[in-house]
A protein has these predicted regions:
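Sec-dependent signal peptide recognition
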Residues: 1-5
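Bacterial Sec-dependent N-terminal signal peptides
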Residues: 6-24
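Ser/Thr- (and often Asn-) enriched beta-sheet segments in non-cytosolic proteins
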Residues: 17, 58-64, 72-76, 91, ...
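Aromatic (Trp/Tyr/Phe) and Gly/Pro-enriched flexible surface segments
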Residues: 19-107
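Extracellular-facing segments of soluble proteins and assemblies that are Gly/Ser/Thr-biased and enriched
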Residues: 85-174
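Short helix-loop boundary/capping segments
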Residues: 142-213
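Long, compositionally biased interface segments
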Residues: 197, 201-257
Length: 257
């Protein structure tokens, strides 16, 4: 398998180009999914259990022709603590459960071949509930074309931590990231069949840049990853446990090569 390095600049302010069908609108169906401008959104309600859309909860994503800029993610879930209900999101690449990835994606990239991997963002969140986080996520796999069985690692960056959910595992580890602002690192080496790690900022970090390569380099130094793993995607969304709220995405740019 030959991997050709790519550089992708996904600019959040670009308008729909001539000939491209507009996806502007409000989407409230479970798992509603659309692609445009190199990004995919998914109204991901993976933990809904027996709750019924429109009766027990609502979950919507509103997009404009400036997509992903101006995207608004909204939700309203019962107050019962039953685990993560949804991770409504925008992403580039291919999730392990996807058949195909997004257009012009730089992924998959093997960690050992990674030269640059950063995420720039500007976000706004609601304050009506504390039952959610705002997080970046990337999946690592042993096979660049693999599905769930190929997953080796789930890496999350919590830009906002609410009262729910809690990171998996513990934070008493040896990770020492040259990363600001202040943060903790959590790890669970036996989470759902793969390793889980999370960088959790101690205060909201909703506008700025995260150097994902710096994080993966540290994980490699610690032996948490070997460097042979493939980065499949980069996701941005809100993990919701309970209550109502919203997330507005003003900017979301991923650079990877």
């Amino acid at each position: 398998y030959v991997l050709i390095p790519l550089i992708v600049f996904l600019v959040s302010s670009c308008n729909v180009t001539t000939g491209e069908t507009s996806i502007a609108g409000k989407y409230c169906d479970d798992w509603a999914t659309k692609d445009a401008n190199g990004y995919r959104f998914s109204n991901n309600v993976w933990g809904k259990d027996t709750y019924q859309n429109g009766t027990d909860y609502t979950a919507c994503i509103t997009v404009t022709d400036d997509y992903p800029a101006g995207t608004v993610i909204e939700w309203s879930w019962p107050s019962y603590r039953g685990g993560v209900r949804s991770y409504q999101e925008i992403y580039i690449g291919r999730k392990p459960w996807d058949t195909t990835g997004t257009n012009n994606s730089p992924f998959p990239i093997q960690i050992n071949n990674l030269k640059e991997f950063k995420v720039e963002f500007d976000l706004e969140r609601s304050y009506s509930s504390t039952g959610f986080n705002v997080a970046l996520e990337t999946w690592l796999a042993s096979d660049p074309d693999g599905g769930q069985s190929a997953i080796t690692d789930e890496v999350m960056i919590w830009l906002h931590e609410g009262s729910e959910p809690s990171p998996s595992g513990g934070n008493g580890n040896s990770a020492n990231l040259a990363l600001t602002p202040s943060h903790e690192v959590w790890r669970n080496a036996s989470h759902s069949g793969w390793d889980y790690s999370a960088v959790v900022f101690e205060a909201d970090y909703l506008s700025g840049t995260v150097d994902m390569k710096l994080i993966l380099d540290e994980w490699k130094w610690l032996g948490w990853v070997s460097g042979e793993e493939y980065i499949l995607d980069l996701e941005l969304g809100a993990e919701v446990v309970l209550g109502e709220g919203s997330l507005t995405i003003n900017k979301f740019i991923v650079t990877a090569n």
